[in-house]
């Protein structure tokens, strides 16, 4: 179930402050964050966030198409190595 419209999108306060400071200074430095739950708002467009995936920080450049999504959607937490296509050693037994 989506969030109520009267509440508005959730954004961590510390993240919003960092973006506002960079917008005031007209700088575009990478913002390191652990807040995967924050919703991307139009103020974030053009900024790069380093979103933590549990192991390292993944750089995410925010575009217009990302508005309304969560930061964590763009930093996958699981690595898929792929299925083994053909294992000849186990078939010989």
From Swiss-Prot:
<keyword id="KW-0687">Ribonucleoprotein</keyword>
<dbReference type="GO" id="GO:0000028">
    <property type="term" value="P:ribosomal small subunit assembly"/>
</dbReference>
<keyword id="KW-0699">rRNA-binding</keyword>
<dbReference type="InterPro" id="IPR002222">
    <property type="entry name" value="Ribosomal_uS19"/>
</dbReference>
<keyword id="KW-0689">Ribosomal protein</keyword>
<dbReference type="GO" id="GO:0019843">
    <property type="term" value="F:rRNA binding"/>
</dbReference>
<dbReference type="GO" id="GO:0003735">
    <property type="term" value="F:structural constituent of ribosome"/>
</dbReference>
<comment type="similarity">
    <text>Belongs to the universal ribosomal protein uS19 family.</text>
</comment>
<dbReference type="InterPro" id="IPR023575">
    <property type="entry name" value="Ribosomal_uS19_SF"/>
</dbReference>
<comment type="function">
    <text>Protein S19 forms a complex with S13 that binds strongly to the 16S ribosomal RNA.</text>
</comment>
<dbReference type="InterPro" id="IPR005732">
    <property type="entry name" value="Ribosomal_uS19_bac-type"/>
</dbReference>
<keyword id="KW-0694">RNA-binding</keyword>
<dbReference type="Pfam" id="PF00203">
    <property type="entry name" value="Ribosomal_S19"/>
</dbReference>
<dbReference type="GO" id="GO:0015935">
    <property type="term" value="C:small ribosomal subunit"/>
</dbReference>
<dbReference type="GO" id="GO:0006412">
    <property type="term" value="P:translation"/>
</dbReference>
<dbReference type="InterPro" id="IPR020934">
    <property type="entry name" value="Ribosomal_uS19_CS"/>
</dbReference>
<dbReference type="GO" id="GO:0005737">
    <property type="term" value="C:cytoplasm"/>
</dbReference>
<protein>
    <recommendedName>
        <fullName>Small ribosomal subunit protein uS19</fullName>
    </recommendedName>
</protein>
């Amino acid at each position: 179930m989506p969030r109520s419209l009267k509440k508005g999108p959730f954004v961590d306060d510390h993240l919003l402050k960092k973006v506002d400071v960079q917008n005031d200074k007209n700088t575009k430095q990478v913002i390191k964050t652990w807040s995967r739950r924050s919703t991307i708002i139009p103020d974030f467009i053009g900024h790069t966030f380093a979103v933590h995936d549990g192991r390292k920080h993944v750089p995410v450049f925010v575009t217009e198409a990302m508005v309304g999504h969560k930061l964590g959607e763009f930093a996958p937490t699981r690595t898929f190595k792929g299925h083994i296509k053909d294992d000849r050693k186990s078939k010989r037994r």
